Each structure stands twice: as structure tokens, then as C-alpha cells.
Amino acid sequence: MSEPTENTRATITVSSKGAQLGEIVLRFFHDVAPGHVKNFTKLAQEGFYNGTSFHRVIPGFMIQGGDPSSKNPDRASHGTGGPGYQIKAEFNSKPHKRGVLSMARSNEPDSAGSQFFICVADANFLDWQYTAFGEVVSGMDVADKVVGMKRDGRDNPLERVEMTVTITE
């Protein structure tokens, strides 16, 4: 597996009920979050994200995915999984604006692993508290479709929203 470069892109192919909703293409912030970029691209190249879902969607805020537990039909476990390790925070000056890719974590700053979120609106209250490590270059319309889906009381979409992530140079 190759090291990510300035030209590295990720494509998240999103589907629901067997129909493709579209693609979200990401570029990375190597300069401010190299560890997070390397972690995300490594997991994607290993196929870790394939078959996981966007398990948390909050209109006016973000869509969250990357949890291996989201492959389990039991939604109670969604949002609790990771890759089996944690990575050190790389808080930086990139603002959490619409389209920014950032790592989800627990209350512990150094607890990120595989779960990530894409802001669908500006969320400056997250600045310097969560690691922004990329941004959407195309496909925000797909993120908007996902965040607009009907959801349960835990902000889990009622229809499964599955992803496949590929890395290109």
C-alpha cells in the first residue's frame, strides 16, 4: 500500500436499498493531519470501510460513518466500533465548515480510530476539538441526500446507507 500524496483522493460510493445514491470525492489535508490521512487511506485500501454505513445523520450538522459495528443488523451497536486502536489527535486551524471531513471520537481527545464525519453545515464549535483532515471536492449533493433521510431517535437512518471507499492518486 502506497503512502498518501497531495494527489491522493478518496471516493465514497453511497448506496441504499441496492440503488446507488452517488459518489462523494474527498481530498486530504496532509499538511495539518498527516497521521489521520495515513490512517484513513490505509483503512480504505484494506477494504475496512466497505459495507459499513452512515449510521448517524443530523440535519444542519453532519453525516457520520466508518464504524465496523454498522455491518451488524442490530442498530444498538452502531457507533461503538473501531479498528482496534486509537490515534493521537491532530487538532488544527482548518475550520469545520460545510464539506469538511473530520474524525469522530469519544470524550477522550486521542480516541479516534475509524469513524469519520462530513459536515453538511458550518460547525465552528468543533474547531480545535476534532481533527479536520480533508474536504469534499465533489458530491455534497450526495451528503445532502443522506442527511435528509428519515431517521430514528438515535439519528440512525431508517434505511441502511452503505458505503464503499476507494483510494486513487
Predicted regions and their residues:
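Cyclophilin-like peptidyl-prolyl cis-trans isomerases
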Residues: 1-169
